[in-house]
Amino acid sequence: KKITEAVHRHGTKVFGQLFHPGAEVLGTDSYGTRTIAWAPSPLNHERCFATTRQLTPELIEEIIKGYAITAERMIEAGYDGVEIVASHGYLPAQFLSPLVNQRTDCWGGSRENRQRFLLDVARLLRQRLPASAIVGLRISLDEKDHLGVKPDEALAALAALEAESLVDYMNIA
């Protein structure tokens, strides 16, 4: 709270970013222990520093709840809002990409299913945060990577978020 209070004294708003690297986690932690890169689907790609494992539906739900818990703590710490990071190949972008997300369950396949992770995160934030909390989204319009999110996928996700008024602003990377 010290930092947010100091910033507020100068009339400035404070936001925190919420992100999960998914497949883009580093291969080892600071102790040299091999890390697990959880992703929508198993992935072998030069952007991945560790072998990926497919997320189970239970882990997906746990991660979504983790976004909300973290956002609640940030608001309690004096942040004015949070920004969901769905850019630069992080986990929400991995779910959006039909080349990365090759699931056949409710989390993959159709465009609507691939959007489910991002929409469920935003819906839960709206449910659990006070109305005064600002919720934003950072998304890459075109990741310029053969496995990355393409403009049509990003624009469709933005339209779905807008249709439900789930975010207050969009930060296009």
Model-inferred region functions:
Residues K1-A173:
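Flavin-dependent oxidoreductase catalytic cores
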